[in-house]
Amino acid sequence: MEHVAIDDFDNWMGPADVKRLLGKALGTEHMGLRFYELAPGDSTAFGYHAHENQEEVFYVLDGELTFETEAGEVTVVADEIIRFAPGEFQRSRNEGDGRVRVLGIGAPADAGELALLRECPDCGERTDQEIEAVDDGDALVTRCVDCGAETGRFA
């Protein structure tokens, strides 16, 4: 048995104001478990994405979270859950004025290949992206695979 308090975790850099990797602390082997707290404009993901092998479930604890999906926008409010199958593209965003707290669950823990798309200002369209650590590991950037332009920076 493992028992932990969410506030005992270090924050993980990324597109969310608060991201805590609960699965690692609990020693989960077959699923990923993350806690997010999103400021207005924040997301749980670096861009519109799909995991090759992993299904994802998001449980909104507080607030309202809007997902861009292949079927259009879907808004999930407190005490609602949304599921995405492996290979299904999505991106969340806090479009409100308040903070959103959400629990993300992914299984299996090994998500496989990540397909990640973001708007590239140099290419003028949404393109494939890579994520890399920069500044001696103090930040993550998303970079366009086609032209190499930096499309996002997260500390």
Task: Place the predicted regions along the sequence by residue.
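Short, conserved beta-strand element in jelly-roll/cupin
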Residues: E37-L38, A50-T69
